[in-house]
Regions:
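A short acidic (Asp/Glu
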Residues: 5-6, 65-69, 96-99
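Conserved N-terminal substructure of TIR/SEFIR domains
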Residues: 1-52, 144-166
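Conserved TIR/SEFIR loop-to-helix hotspot centered on a Trp-containing motif
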Residues: 59-77
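Conserved beta-strand segments of the P-loop GTPase G domain that flank and frequently precede/overlap
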Residues: 55-59, 88-89
Length: 166
């Protein structure tokens, strides 16, 4: 997914400030089983000054533990409001993706009464800007809908698309 993620950043970075967790080989690996420590590190290194988390969804994204960790940290209320949460399918998925469990727990098809929203790949910067603004507004208007009670994934899961563990 790295090529598509890089293209997304290149094409739309005028609309948002990219902070990417897990897309690059040189990203910090948070080697700990201490849930609190992992969430604090993600918050401090990647989310500290962000207000919206965009999950770019490839064919196997749903199986990756780092995605679960980033979503859990994003939804966590603490000294900051939780981040708004939105998902975007990457072009190679043909808009058919399996959502990460924690994302799906915060999403409803049709976007009625849910915290997270899921979108097909944007056709314009205006679309993306509108979606980001909606996700930011959700921090104040829909935070009561957040479902973030499940524990963090300890391991990568088996991909529902290809059957491999990533």
């Amino acid at each position: 997914d790295r090529v598509e993620v890089d293209a997304f950043i290149r094409n739309f970075s005028s609309v948002f400030i990219p902070k990417v967790l897990g897309a690059n080989n040189n990203d910090d690996f948070i080697d700990s089983t201490n849930t609190e420590y992992v969430m604090q590190r993600i918050r401090r290194l990647y989310l500290q000054d962000s207000t919206v988390t965009i999950v770019l969804l490839g064919n196997c994204t749903h199986a990756r533990r780092y995605i679960d960790w980033e979503i859990k940290s994003s939804l966590r209320a603490g000294s900051n409001l939780p981040n708004g949460l939105m998902g975007i399918s990457l072009p190679s998925t043909n808009n058919k993706v399996n959502l990460p469990e924690r994302f799906e727990s915060n999403w409803v098809q049709g976007h009625a009464h849910c915290y997270a929203k899921f979108w097909n790949y944007p056709t314009s910067t205006r679309d993306l800007q509108d979606w980001i603004e909606d996700a930011q507004e959700s921090r104040l208007t829909r935070a009561y809908l957040i479902n973030n009670s499940d524990g963090m994934k300890r391991y990568n899961g088996k991909c529902k698309k290809c059957g491999e563990t990533h």
